[in-house]
A protein has these predicted regions:
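Peripheral (often C-terminal) accessory segments that flank ATP-dependent C-N-forming ligase machineries
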Residues: 2, 285-347
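Protein kinase-like catalytic core scaffold
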Residues: 195, 243, 255-259
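Active-site "cap" helix and flanking loop/linker of ATP-utilizing ligase/carboxylase catalytic domains
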Residues: 224-245, 251, 261-309
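Active-site nucleotide/adenylate-binding loops and adjacent lid/helix of ATP-dependent enzymes
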Residues: 98-183, 187-233
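Short, hydrophobic beta-strand segments that form beta-sheet elements in well-ordered domains
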Residues: 8, 28-33, 68-71, 120-121, ...
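Short acidic-glycine loop/turn motifs at beta-strand connectors
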Residues: 188-193, 250-253, 346-347
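ATP-binding N-terminal substructure of ATP-dependent carboxylate-amine bond-forming enzymes
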Residues: 1-100, 104
Length: 347
């Protein structure tokens, strides 16, 4: 069977790393991005610049590929649905529709007996005042929030002005007494067919991932519960490809699912060097119908995100043999922008 030509929507670092993994497997990639300077132009076999909602651009893209995947979840559902009518989209657009909304995402998790933080839907200021048991809490937009965007910490009901715009739809989540954050990256190939990575421990600054390490420090009980919950999510979604479930552990060692990322995940970047098969290669293998190989951890590892001007001190640095530097080749350095990462393995 010949290998498919793979279309990837999105030209950021995740698209770049997916394209690099595909090249290793001799799979041609065509990337569609609405950013003419997207870094993935340096990694894809072919690059198309254009509006995701321009039907002519979409048709040109689809003529060049056999199937489509994507690097980020905030693509409008209707766009993915239209594409899926012409060429197969994996993971399914229906999954994206569910996960794009924090309220339906949490309802899905709870329906499958997966514990989340306490939450309530918020439509106006009165809703916050009525639901003060969720304070202190985080007020989040139901859609389009990432890396801390669209989030507001609420310490009391008077923190918001009367003119605050609630039209986007919000969810208020009670803040847990946080001990640590972890993530579980899993690739599902089909019914009960998985490759799953052990939990990764994560540390954030300004609500942006700063560094990660594998293995995470935790009890076997919590580890196994997190792995089981991640598998349940993938199975119940009928997911194909790599995805991630982010978790909180509180100071009483209770586990809470925070959110689902229906794509490869920033915390999983270290798998490029820590494992024989990375999260990116497993995603390509799953969506392209290639053989599932046993994924093994070879090294413990730590990953440091290089954010904004952090990248500048690493560009001409000499690295040790156990250090691996990745420059995303973004044209412009911006504050709070992920510019690259450094992975250190323990030999």
């Amino acid at each position: 069977m010949s290998k498919p030509d793979l279309g990837i929507i999105g030209g950021g670092q995740l698209g770049s790393l997916l394209a690099s993994a595909a090249k290793k497997l001799n799979i041609k990639t065509v990337i569609l991005s609405d950013d003419k300077d997207a870094p993935a132009i340096n990694f894809a076999d072919e690059f198309i610049y254009g509006d995701y909602q321009d039907i002519n651009i979409i048709n040109n893209f689809l003529e060049k590929v056999d199937l489509v995947t994507y690097e980020f979840e905030n693509i409008p559902y209707e766009i993915l649905k239209k594409i899926n009518e012409i060429k197969s989209v994996l993971p399914s657009p229906e999954i994206n529709k569910l996960i794009q909304n924090r309220l339906t995402e949490k309802e899905f998790l709870n329906k499958n007996n997966i514990t989340t933080t306490q939450y309530v839907s918020i439509n106006d200021l009165d809703d916050i005042k009525i639901n003060d048991k969720f304070i202190p809490g985080l007020l989040k937009t139901c859609t389009l929030g990432y890396d801390g965007k669209g989030q507001y910490k609420i310490n009391n009901a008077n923190d918001l002005n009367n003119d605050f715009d609630f039209s986007k739809g919000y969810i208020l989540e009670k803040i847990v007494n946080l001990k640590k954050e972890i993530s579980v990256v899993v690739t599902r190939f089909g019914h009960q067919k998985y490759e799953i990575y052990d939990p990764i421990e994560n540390y954030h600054e300004d609500q942006i991932l700063k560094h990660s390490k594998i293995p995470a420090d935790m009890s076997d009980e919590i580890k196994n519960k997190a792995l089981d919950w991640a598998k349940t999510v993938a199975e119940e979604l009928d997911y194909i490809g790599t995805m991630c479930v982010e978790f909180f552990i509180d100071k009483n060692n209770n586990l809470y699912a925070n959110e689902v990322a229906p794509r490869v995940h920033n915390s999983g970047h270290l798998t490029i060097n820590s494992h024989n098969i990375s999260q990116f290669e497993n995603h390509i293998r799953a969506v392209c119908g290639l053989e599932k190989l046993e994924t093994k951890k070879i090294y413990n590892a730590k990953m440091l995100n290089l954010i904004g001007e952090d990248i500048l001190e690493y560009k001409n640095k000499k690295f040790k043999e156990n250090e691996f530097f990745y420059d995303y080749l973004k044209k412009e350095v911006k504050a709070k922008r992920k510019m690259g990462h450094l992975t250190t393995i323990e030999k």
